Amino acid sequence: MPGDYYEILGVSRDANKDEIKRAYRRLARKYHPDVNKEIGAEERFKEINRAYEILSEPETRARYDRFGEAGVSSGAGSGFEYGDMGGIADIFETIFSGFGGMGTGTSSRRRTGPVRGDDLRLDFKLNFREAVFGGEKEIRIRHLETCQVCEGSGAKPGTGSRTCSTCSGSGQVRRATRTPFGTFAQVSVCPTCNGSGEVIEEKCEACGGSGRKQETKKLKITIPAGVDNGTRLRVSREGDAGQRGGPPGDLYVYLSVETDEEFQREGIDIKSEISISYLQAILGCRLSVNTVDGPEEITIEPGTQPNTVLTLPNRGVPKLGNPVARGDHLITINVSIPTRVNPEERELLEKLAKIRGESHGKGGIEGFLGGLFHK
């Protein structure tokens, strides 16, 4: 009876498709019979392939999750046949590309079809307020664009291309290798046509035959309100141009936010601090404080204690994707106690201490403001 397929691949039961594929690639490379000659490696390799065969397909995975092996055993072979690898064959080409590319001998795909362009990454820095409120920003990128002279063909205008004689248009060259486990085809990219299956008669002078040119471009992008460090924005079709009529890739903009001297951010809340005098703390007052929306008046209640936190509702960061909802602005009150007072102030404070029935010493007033002042 086969073991648990999740345990065989070393993944959790809630692993996504990419995690399962990565685990399979790692284990298949390790236990492939052409690589691992240890006893039991072949059997382990078959288990790994069976596990991937079941877990890589949503339908069979769902049956396995619900009924176990009984849900997938009907009509499914217990062994693994190299000639019927399905999507696994594509992974094999990737896994063993370092060994010259190992295939199954059944694939003869041409590589002359459209190829999507690569995605690109751009790191972009915002100041604190730009991250809070968003807005439109201009960026500059360098990417590959389709050559306007040859329209992406790579051929000099008025000339064409012919089928590569080295690979007969397949874009691949193969070499059969016999092993104790059967005959395998080692596959590599054709060195003559670089995998295109065609050879250009005369290269385009503008792009050197590649069909694409490196260009610098200015773009305006919209920064949504409430972004934070690590927020990723996708700009469709602004990556590298595709090849042979393929679509362009996408541009991914990764945002970072500069620190602010006055404000700190915690989730969608903003934090700041202000200092008031001990008299303002005792008597209370009205003050103007800075917020990301501008100055705002707050009330310091009489008897406010050090480290009191005042909350300004809806003065924080807009929630990403729902800018109507905002966090709060939390203001910590620091009370400044003077280290020295002049004689007149001291006399008044001593009278206050006497009224309150509190003692004081040479080093300062004890009790209400005890031990806080020095001559």
UniProtKB/Swiss-Prot annotation:
Zn(2+) 1 binds at residues 147, 150, 204, 207. The keyword Repeat applies. Binds 2 Zn(2+) ions per monomer. Signal peptide: none annotated. CDD domains: DnaJ, DnaJ_C, DnaJ_zf. A zinc finger (CR-type) spans 134-216. PANTHER family: CHAPERONE PROTEIN DNAJ A6, CHLOROPLASTIC, DNAJ HOMOLOG 1, MITOCHONDRIAL-RELATED. This is Chaperone protein DnaJ. It comes from Gloeothece citriformis (strain PCC 7424) (Cyanothece sp. (strain PCC 7424)). The lineage of its organism: Bacteria, Bacillati, Cyanobacteriota, Cyanophyceae, Oscillatoriophycideae.
